[in-house]
């Protein structure tokens, strides 16, 4: 879908002078063309970011994939589309190269913004019948072991149906957006970002008793921690962690509203896979 630009929120990587300077140049460039723009630093405060984004029609995020992930997670359900400007190394989530930002914004102003709705995940940790922790994820929800090199025991259910017990280093529940992250390193599948599915991929499973699964977006996954001797942690997007206990049940499902990514279609998904080395053409 397309959306008209009214005002723009520019979010810069925390403590990054290049991002701050570029943000100010963008603000001045947009103001000269009659658009309202505000520059804020990504401090990690979800409330202040949500308030800043209430009246904007687009969020420009200046940084690497980590910065884009953090901002996208805090904007879940806000209805504000996000467009990444790459100042990092990989930049798979970024649509715009920092060296070509002016021409990219010109395209935005001339044609409007094309917005893609992508699946995101919500999760909650149930302990003794009560919810003790909850949150959302743009890339993945990971359950894994602590510092000791031991497998952990997890029990998996999809809806009311039990899949079985998994003995592994951990488990990755990934969105299509996160399929090119931790999941693919664990031999999870590449998934087109516009598909409304999510994947379940074991990390080094003992005896390979569970292959990667692709679940429909409507499915609800429940993971029970059976391990009583090892440290087990839940992490969201590789950025925020939470210690789990034996008997905890992690419920994962599709987040309402999902997340919105703006695109100017400079590089198709398949060309991006090739450019980032996920597909190698031998011809």
From Swiss-Prot:
One of its GO terms (molecular function) is metal ion binding. Keywords: ATP-binding, Cytoplasm, Kinase, NAD, NADP, Nucleotide-binding, Transferase. Its EC number is 2.7.1.23. Pfam families: NAD_kinase, NAD_kinase_C. It is found in: Cytoplasm. GO terms for biological process: NAD metabolic process; NADP biosynthetic process. It is an enzyme of class 2 (transferase). It catalyses: NAD(+) + ATP = ADP + NADP(+) + H(+). GO terms for cellular component: cytoplasm. Its cofactor is a divalent metal cation. The keyword Zinc-finger does not apply. InterPro entries: ATP-NAD_kinase_N, ATP-NAD_kinase_PpnK-typ_C, NAD/diacylglycerol_kinase_sf, NADK. NAD(+) binds at residues 65-66, 139-140, 150, 167, 169, 180-185, 239. Signal peptide: none annotated. The active site is at 65 (proton acceptor). Involved in the regulation of the intracellular balance of NAD and NADP, and is a key enzyme in the biosynthesis of NADP. Catalyzes specifically the phosphorylation on 2'-hydroxyl of the adenosine moiety of NAD to yield NADP. PANTHER family: NAD KINASE (PTHR20275:SF0). Belongs to the NAD kinase family. This is NAD kinase. It comes from Nitratidesulfovibrio vulgaris (strain DSM 19637 / Miyazaki F).
């Amino acid at each position: 879908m397309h959306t008209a630009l009214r005002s723009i929120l520019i979010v810069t990587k925390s403590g990054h002078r290049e991002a701050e300077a570029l943000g100010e140049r963008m603000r001045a460039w947009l103001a000269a063309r009659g658009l309202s723009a505000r520059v804020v630093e990504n401090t990690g405060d979800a409330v202040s970011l949500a308030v800043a984004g209430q009246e904007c029609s687009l969020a420009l995020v200046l940084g690497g994939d980590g910065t884009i992930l953090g901002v996208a997670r805090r904007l879940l359900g806000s209805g504000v589309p996000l467009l990444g400007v790459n100042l990092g190394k990989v930049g798979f989530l970024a649509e715009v190269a920092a060296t070509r930002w002016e021409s990219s914004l010109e395209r935005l102003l001339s044609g409007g913004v094309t917005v893609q709705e992508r699946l995101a995940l919500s999760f909650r940790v149930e302990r003794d019948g009560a919810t003790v922790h909850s949150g959302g994820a743009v890339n993945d929800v990971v359950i894994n072991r602590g510092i000791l090199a031991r497998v952990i025991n997890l029990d998996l259910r999809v809806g009311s149906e039990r899949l079985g017990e998994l003995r592994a280093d951990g488990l990755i529940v990934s969105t299509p957006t996160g399929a090119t992250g931790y999941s693919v390193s664990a031999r999870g599948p590449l998934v087109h970002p516009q598909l409304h599915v999510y994947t379940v991929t074991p990390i080094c499973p003992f005896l390979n008793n569970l292959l990667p699964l692709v679940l429909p977006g409507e499915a609800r996954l429940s993971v029970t921690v059976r391990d009583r001797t090892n440290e087990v942690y839940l992490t969201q997007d590789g950025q925020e962690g939470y210690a789990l206990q034996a008997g905890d049940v992690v419920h994962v499902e599709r987040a309402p509203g999902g997340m919105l990514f703006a695109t100017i279609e400079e590089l198709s998904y398949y060309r991006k896979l090739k450019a980032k080395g996920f597909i190698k053409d031998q011809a």
